[in-house]
Amino acid sequence: MEGIDHLADERNKAEFDVEDMKIVWAGSRHAFEVSDRIARLVASDPVFEKSNRARLSRKELFKSTLRKCAHAFKRIIELRLNEEEAGRLRHFIDQPAYVDLHWGMFVPAIKGQGTEEQQKKWLSLANKMQIIGCYAQTELGHGSNVQGLETTATFDPKTDEFVIHTPTQTASKWWPGGLGKVSTHAVVYARLITNGKDYGIHGFIVQLRSLEDHSPLPNITVGDIGTKMGNGAYNSMDNGFLMFDHVRIPRDQMLMRLSKVTREGEYVPSDVPKQLVYGTMVYVRQTIVADASNALSRAVCIATRYSAVRRQFGAHNGGIETQVIDYKTQQNRLFPLLASAYAFRFVGEWLKWLYTDVTERLAASDFATLPEAHACTAGLKSLTTTATADGIEECRKLCGGHGYLWCSGLPELFAVYVPACTYEGDNVVLQLQVARFLMKTVAQLGSGKVPVGTTAYMGRAAHLLQCRSGVQKAEDWLNPDVVLEAFEARALRMAVTCAKNLSKFENQEQGFQELLADLVEAAIAHCQLIVVSKFIAKLEQDIGGKGVKKQLNNLCYIYALYLLHKHLGDFLSTNCITPKQASLANDQLRSLYTQVRPNAVALVDAFNYTDHYLNSVLGRYDGNVYPKLFEEALKDPLNDSVVPDGYQEYLRPVLQQQLRTARL
């Protein structure tokens, strides 16, 4: 029934202050107030309606996206929103669009790689959206292997221009968001060739379309790559292809902060350290980890609320059935995902700090922590996006058959999110980057060089290689030192084992290729340790609010002990713990599920998501699921008439046994 909170009993069970938890989740009271205000602004604006996306054709969906983006920019100007508020507005509109790449990739690329003069020229246009840009790096034939890109930029000293060319079909730019139909400009990555020498991949600002009528400029072939997975979902984005046929651009449209080409064609590296590029990479990957927390928490919110509403089995003598959330099988699948959402939130907060720290160090020409920061962000991008994609799908299954409906919000959320496993670095390739860094760190352990940052634990190798867990009872697994030591010992021992196995090969690169699977597992162990350690570090902070810290403590140990359970083979094979201690960890995990159970709905309420943002019948705040499922069903175009279109031509002949005479 309308106006009734079907989840009121669940909310009354909460043992903590939800309003205070909202502040913790948001990161600060200021961040909460901004998000809350902007989320409600978006939810109340009819232009940002999105419940009909699955029923739109691709063209209709794309046109609605253009409308929403224009309306959003208009509102930003009218309300004089600052950069933070504008970012939250785009976030809560919740529809992949060209603006994501314009603000998220095109503008940062110019800021990071353009000279002051170039920034002044191009950013003044981009910030007013007088030009719209994208980031054209990935090609049909190369993605992860950036050095394998084939597009060329050959300097012509006669005209003081670069000639941008696509020499082969596989050199076509393929996938850049915003490229297919919208972008007027792109930062194009190509092989810089001058005086007959190839200087590798560099960025160039290239105009693609006329600013008068939006038609492609001469010798440029550009379009959309086609429909992608899911209804609605990422099909609102014009991922595109792009080919150049000897397109000429002025020399000063090469991004020249890190290197330049003179009028005479001489290639000159600048005094600016090339490592600055990694600072931008740390920033981008930090935002991806934050997005992982957002996406997973949405799925968990839907699955938790619906699990509390749904009842199946367990009725005795005509009594009420059991809430699905009360089954331990449901808790064992759901609560670790709830814990993961919080864990990723806090490691994302830490990555923001890391980005600031790296930026300050780079400004002071201090590159000591850069390799570790680069490996760390690569690994966490991989870990969190993989876990989130898998977690969204698990939440769909947790909602049973109804989770398969588009109106559950979960199929579209999955289709929108899953590309994160391959964009900005394929997840397996990224973990191999982490593995190379770990092998280098292990090799230096005997040289006196002290590991730093997230690898600092390796400096205690002598202890971690021989220590044994002292756990004797289940409650011992609530000791942060015990948990950290187990995860540190596991990560170190897996890395050392890989290093020893590598040393058996005369050709180290051949050995690396042979041991790829083991190296990925070692990298994952290291990254999971980072997340666990940052969650524990969060608990060491001063966190106010009735019962808030207690709930976070429970979630922290659910996250850690579930990982221990899931990767038990690692912990046992490296002799970090005994089978008996593993059994005690499972006992403690079940106890934690029991403690979280009465707080589960309140813990997802703390995400403070509006029904508009969730866009889920199953995850409604009021829990009024079943009537709304019927409402959504009746909105489907198939229900516009009681007799389907096509009955006379195709169905009636079958039913009337008239197929032989029917004109099909």
Swiss-Prot record:
Disulfide bonds join 467-576. SUPFAM superfamilies: Acyl-CoA dehydrogenase C-terminal domain-like, Acyl-CoA dehydrogenase NM domain-like. The keyword Phosphoprotein does not apply. FAD binds at residues 135, 137-138, 144, 177, 310, 330, 333, 401, 422, 426. Induction: Induced by dehydration, abscisic acid (ABA) and jasmonic acid (JA), and locally and systemically by wounding. GO terms for cellular component: cytosol; peroxisome; plasmodesma. Its cofactor is FAD. Its EC number is 1.3.3.6. The active site is at 424 (proton acceptor). Its main location: other. It catalyses: a 2,3-saturated acyl-CoA + O2 = a (2E)-enoyl-CoA + H2O2. It is found in: Peroxisome. One of its GO terms (biological process) is long-chain fatty acid metabolic process. Gene3D superfamilies: Acyl-CoA dehydrogenase/oxidase, N-terminal domain, Butyryl-CoA Dehydrogenase, subunit A, domain 2, Butyryl-CoA Dehydrogenase, subunit A, domain 3. It comes from the Eukaryota. Keywords: Disulfide bond, FAD, Fatty acid metabolism, Flavoprotein, Lipid metabolism, Oxidoreductase, Peroxisome. The keyword Zinc does not apply. A motif (Microbody targeting signal) lies at residues 662-664. GO terms for molecular function: acyl-CoA oxidase activity; FAD binding. InterPro entries: ACOX_C_alpha1, Acyl-CoA_ox_N, Acyl-CoA_Oxase/DH_mid-dom, Acyl-CoA_Oxase/DH_mid-dom_sf, Acyl-CoA_oxidase, Acyl-CoA_oxidase_C, AcylCo_DH-like_C, AcylCoA_DH/ox_N_sf. Belongs to the acyl-CoA oxidase family. Homodimer. Catalyzes the desaturation of both long- and medium-chain acyl-CoAs to 2-trans-enoyl-CoAs. Most active with C14-CoA. Activity on long-chain mono-unsaturated substrates is 40% higher than with the corresponding saturated substrates. Seems to be an important factor in the general metabolism of root tips. May be involved in the biosynthesis of jasmonic acid. This is Peroxisomal acyl-coenzyme A oxidase 1. It comes from Arabidopsis thaliana (Mouse-ear cress). The gene is ACX1.
